[in-house]
Amino acid sequence: MLISIATGLGMQYEIKNKISAFNGDISIYNFQTTNYENSSIPLDFDEDLYTNISNINGVVSVQKIATKFGLVRTKKDFDGVYFKGVDQNYNWEKIKRFLIEGNFPNISNSISNQIIISKLLANRLNLEVGDSFQMLFSRNSESSAIRKFEITGIFSSGFNELDS
């Protein structure tokens, strides 16, 4: 009985750490963002807000991200994905242990076309490090935004809900 409790607690701890590594411990969204939208409305993130959050006891880092749903399109297939964009200050340390091939993207002040994808997505679409693909994002207008990305790395959390 003691072994099963310890195993259960260890598994629970590992799942929590994986979710935290990819999604953070706390997420702050614009109040106007609703669940049915395919992306979040940007939060007006000024320096005072950043400083106030950073000064809270226990806060290690504050990361700005952008999220959007879209379609990955290759020459032979496509798949829907949840896209997460980061800036040049993003801290890759928490997810470093999940990178199984390649490198993290080189992010600078300019728009980057480099991306990491999950092993699960790479297998489904027959993609590997160095390959390129198109990503289609919906916009408020009738036309879609199309961007081309190059895969610099592949990760695997071992947790299908995160890798899908």
Feature roles, as predicted:
Residues 1-5:
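Hydrophobic membrane-insertion alpha-helices, especially the h-region
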Residues 6-82, 106-110:
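Hydrophobic, regular-secondary-structure patches
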Residues 34, 88-90, 157:
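Active-site/binding-pocket entry motifs
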Residues 37, 73, 94, 144, ...:
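Generic domain-boundary/flexible-linker signal
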Residues 66, 81-86, 103-164:
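Hydrophobic secondary-structure segments that place a key small or acidic residue at a functional site
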Residues 90-98:
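Cytochrome P450 core scaffold surrounding the K-helix E-X-X-R motif
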